[in-house]
Amino acid sequence: MITGLIGINGSGKTTRLKNLYAQHAPGAAQFVPDNPIIPIEVSAHELLHRLGRMHRLPRAEAKRRATILCDELAIDGGTTRAISTYSAGNYKKTALAIVFIKPAQHLYLDEPLEMVDAISRARILRILRRISNLGHQVTISTQDFTIAEQCDAIEVMADLEVVAEGAPRAVLGGDPFTRLMELSGAEFTDCQADWLADPGGANTEVGPGLESQAGSETSPATGLAADGRGE
């Protein structure tokens, strides 16, 4: 089962992940923080191979899994360059591969899809689904409604508490942005940064249910117009 934690910044998603992780006996769970710290002097392949051996995998199997993960996650330089040279996205994918080499029964991943490209995101979600299908419990935090909707269940966090839980569609309905504001007690008010206002006075402000003056509907969650152009 894949459970997604969703909520505004500071709502308690990371705290909940840590608390859940701490309830397990050593070795029964793995936790990957939002900003993981991993060895950087070796390549991803070498690191994964070493960790596989630490997990008592046979040498050939550890090497095989390391090779597959570097390829599956498209880690650029995964077999040839030190992790210290990686981009933020490839660094993040390497950190996730560490728990994929031999997953524990419970995985707690804080913003695992942040900073990775769209294709890598789909690949990571596919791996998480495979792990879940093997009977493991996967819990992730996310700010992305499209990711939350792919989870089996979600928990909405507010003020360090779970304020709603259940199937994504049942909890968030057809308007996730507005529903999250309601559950979180948040507001989408007028922008107070008056020095950034249009000097011509044109009404180009956008928000839930609003349209720009040009009539191009804009998503408050992404800032993109309906035709894909940024405002």
What is the predicted role of each segment?
Residues 49, 61-78, 97:
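Conserved ABC ATPase "signature" region
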Residues 161-184:
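Conserved beta-strand-loop-alpha-helix hinge in the C-terminal portion
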Residues 141-143:
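H-loop/switch region of ABC-family ATPase nucleotide-binding domains
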